Design a protein with these regions (language model features):
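Metal-dependent phosphoesterase signature
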Residues: 3-39, 48
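Residue-level marker of regulatory loop/turn positions in helix-turn-helix DNA-binding domains and
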Residues: 34, 55, 87
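Asp-based, Mg2+/Mn2+-dependent phosphohydrolase catalytic module
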Residues: 43-46, 59-166
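Short, flexible loop segments at the rims of nucleotide/cofactor-binding pockets, characterized by
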Residues: 28-33, 57, 125-126
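Helix-loop "lid/cap" segments that line or gate small-molecule binding pockets
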Residues: 1-9, 66, 98-99
Length: 166
């Protein structure tokens, strides 16, 4: 049921192997890098006083380790992880909780997602959803309200046209 809900055409054994590999990667991977242009994009948002958050289905130990290793912890006001909520994506709870902690109405939030389950969660929460297509694992983001392939190109999206570079 979990594999079906996550929309992943893999076996349980493959999922367990991938989870172990990903955990090791977040904690020890020498090639762990942020997506190209992400630092600049986050800096531009922060320079304008725009609050930011992370809402992930991954457990907090891995996300916080990765954010720390990437020196990105300070770029986010809120971090919500899979073990901090009762229901994970595609349920909207992670996004609703993040919006609440940011002091924002979900309709005032932009979700950046690279998976169908995350896009459904963001839309169910009432957020505008930007589908990111620059991840190494490409998934269908056609249900998103907007798409972006490279964070360097953020100013091509009307929502960000007036966002000053950091």
């Amino acid at each position: 049921a979990l594999l079906k809900r996550a929309e992943m055409p893999v076996t349980l054994e493959q999922l367990q192997t991938e989870r172990a590999r990903r955990g090791n990667y977040y904690e020890n991977g020498a090639d762990l890098h942020p997506q190209p242009g992400l630092r600049e994009f986050l800096s531009a948002l922060r320079a304008q006083g725009i609050r930011t958050g992370v809402a992930s289905s991954t457990r907090s130990q891995l996300i916080l380790t990765a954010l720390d290793r990437l020196h990105l912890v300070s770029q986010f006001d809120v971090v919500i992880c899979g073990d901090m909520v009762t229901r994970r994506k595609p349920d909207p709870e992670p996004y609703l909780r993040a919006a609440q902690l940011l002091g924002l109405a979900p309709g005032d939030c932009l979700v950046i997602e690279d998976s169908p389950a995350g896009i459904r969660a963001g839309k169910a929460a009432g957020c505008t959803v930007l589908g990111y297509t620059g991840s190494s694992i490409r998934q269908d983001v056609s249900a998103a309200d907007l798409t972006l392939s490279d964070f360097h190109l953020y100013r091509q999206i009307p929502l960000f046209q007036n966002l000053s570079p950091f």
